[in-house]
Amino acid sequence: MGVGGLFQVALSRKQLRHDFKKILNHRRKLTISAIALAAYPLAFYSSMRLAGVAIGTVISIATAPFFAVLLECLFSKGKSITKKWLLSFSVGIAGIMLLVFSESSATHTVSNLRLIGILLGFMAGLFYAVYSWVAKTLIEQGVESQSALGCIFGFGSLILLPTLLVTGENLFASTTNILVVGYMALIPMGLGYIAYGFGLRFVTASSASLITLFEPVVAAALAVVVVGESIPLLGWSGIGLILICLLIQVKDS
């Protein structure tokens, strides 16, 4: 994500110069959002390591929409939880749980570490929600989406990249590793978040984070098509519920 942040800055440099004065008016929000963005992957991956991939994934992904709508209700004028959002959220969370736990196995993690992992999962969801809410707020106040994300990712990268000194020992050890890093930086972290920022121009942060529940569905589809894995019936049921969740979100939009 740190390398992807530099890519975001490079792509948005012209727009950043254009919106520089507007950005300066939101220094506090940008700082909070950059810290949240940098902390998100650290909390997310640590949660999966300590609590298990299934539990860490479910908590991190499922709590982000909840925290996002909570931030909107507390700090954004005229925003409230709608029945449509609540229904979509409930269906989506049920789908995520079925999909992820359909292939999970019993964990042998020490209980105290597992609790820490669960807590980190909640923190990851909160960090992602903070980033999304701040980005949406900046866009609503006249900052272009490309500038908002470029600035947030740029400052986030300055915080995140030094962690490579501790965690990135083998990151560039082989050609394969370098290609994977390049792909992750350019496609998911670069183009993916550009698309996410563009979407924030038209939907709320809570709706955008809810739509990202589609991410595990794509991962499951790639696992079947590319890797040749099989998904149990319970997992397919979860995918169906997630698709229903998305249909509820886009209905009448």
Feature annotation, model-predicted:
Residues 56-63, 134-157, 189-225:
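Helix-helix packing/entry segments at the starts of transmembrane helices
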Residues 12-56, 60, 98, 185-203:
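Specific transmembrane alpha-helical segments of multi-pass solute transporters/efflux pumps
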Residues 47, 74-77, 138, 148, ...:
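Hydrophobic/aromatic residues within transmembrane alpha-helices
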Residues 1-10, 86-94, 115-123, 134-187:
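Hydrophobic alpha-helical transmembrane segments of multi-pass integral membrane proteins
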Residues 4, 34-35, 39-43, 107-137:
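Glycine-/small-residue-enriched transmembrane alpha-helix faces in small-molecule transporters
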Residues 22-26, 101-127, 165-183, 230-240:
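Juxtamembrane helix-entry segments on the extracytoplasmic side of multipass membrane proteins
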Residues 1-39, 65-71, 127-131, 149-167, ...:
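Transmembrane alpha-helices of multi-pass small-molecule transport proteins
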Residues 5-8, 81-103, 213, 222, ...:
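Hydrophobic transmembrane alpha-helices of multi-pass small-molecule transport proteins
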